Amino acid sequence: MQKGMEVGIFTFWTSKDNYGQTLQCFALKYFLNHQNGMNAEVIRYYATKLPLIVRIKNAVKRILLYICPSINRSQYENIKSLEERNFAKFKKYHIKYSSSTSYGKIELNKVSGKYDALITGSDQVWSMLLDNPDNSVYYLDFGNKKQKRISYAASFGLQVYPSNIIGELHNQLSRLDYISVREEDGVDICNKAGVNSVHVLDPTFLLDKKIYEKLLKSPPAISYTFMYVLNIQDGDDIDWNNLRKEIATSLIIGTNGSGYTSSQVILDGIVYENSTIEKWLTNIAYADMIVTTSFHGVVFSIIFEKEFVFIPLKGRHAPSNNRVLSLLNKLDLTDRVLFENRTFKQIEKNKVDYEKVNHKLDRFRSKSIRFLMDSLIAK
């Protein structure tokens, strides 16, 4: 093992309300640094830099909203919700970032030379299609030739890659020394691009549950169901009127996902919270039941060994179901999916056998860790 190895993690990192994005950054950094003695950090990168005049206008607009919220109530509520979530505090204390921010590939080349290895992923970094040449950075086309280039649990966010750019995908993937993807669909796409890849776990699974338990806060005093529902417009998208009748607890706590504010009450009868990272984890860890449309909502339900129900999305967001179904299929948990031929009550009656799940998960985790560590220490 190469203690002190310098590793640059290249992934999505800017969100102020995406719990999964932030926790996968935390998990990969923690695994490499605290459990394996490396010096890994998330590379701060933007494709472009906003002109100074635009940044000044945005700052003035923010000040005016505080002085007079009625100017734009929805924008004001959005700012307030982000402050309540307070991702900045979690990132400051729990995630290491590069000391400088790179704007564009030229600056990225200047600062990335210090790393012994570069890792792209996790998250849907390869959903950034290669018909835009700027997106090749997610295939690590920067730095120097001596650096190891690894993808860890990278996701395409697609079942089928556009055929007109599959040749360019081959070129970009061929640059990488070691390739792993988060979904089985990703393995298929890599095969069609003419490269081999390994199916691995999301980095949040690399850590023991005890690591996350150290982040937990005091739980609510009474029993509750936790709802973490993304990418719906109204209750009809998940048949909420009928679903609400089947949920046993009187208290339902909900956290809106990216793009929603506290003023947007999507589902009646829910107590909404703009949770911090720690409170979001707490709400999952102590819930009687988790109901979610989210990949990381499912992930942390499994990590904390909770009863959960996954509701597949419909319409234009339906492709995002694939990453969840890939994971559930691997762990023999597809009976937790609220398909149209099942009811919530039917799923609720069948308790998750976490002894069997953890046996499968441990083997998959060992395979994932072996891939990552072998890739990093290979000569």
Show the residue positions of the predicted features.
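Active-site anion-handling motifs in enzyme catalytic cores
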Residues: 1-379
